[in-house]
Amino acid sequence: MAFVVSSAFAQGKGEVPDSLFDKAVEFIKRAEGWHRGQMPYIGYGHCLLPGETLTENLSKAQADSLLRSDLRKCCDAFREFENDALLLGVLSYNVGIFRLKGHGRMPKSRLIRKLEKGERDINEEYVSFRCYKGKVIPSIERRRKAEFALFYIP
């Protein structure tokens, strides 16, 4: 599958083109599904934060707006990785920014360490985020492989 990449993105400025961002939003919608009655998750996987007064009675438009806002924050957190900002943003939307970047006693992930060294062979590290409670979950593994195929720019 080939993508036409905007010139700012191709030049490595870390800007995610709208067409690719929209594709990521649609992918997450399909993968997450609609969360109703599964608090603290609402809409398309938004985790309620302390102080947020949202309820699970969101409209699809509100949930879409919330997803876009959350994904934009995730992509912005990885802006220094330029072409990989969207790929890392999509992953961090699901696993959390600090699981990748590290924080306090939590070390940086192998994926981030490899990218910081300039290594581009990251498929194995990306797909390694496929476990839940220490067990490999086949559906999560399929999702990671699909994300990598769609959003990795060599």
Language-model-derived ranges and their functions:
Residues 1-4:
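Bacterial N-terminal signal peptides
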Residues 6-38, 46-53, 58-77, 97-154:
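Long, amphipathic alpha-helical surface segments
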Residues 79-85:
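Structural motif
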Residues 85-99:
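Short N-proximal segments of mature Sec-exported proteins
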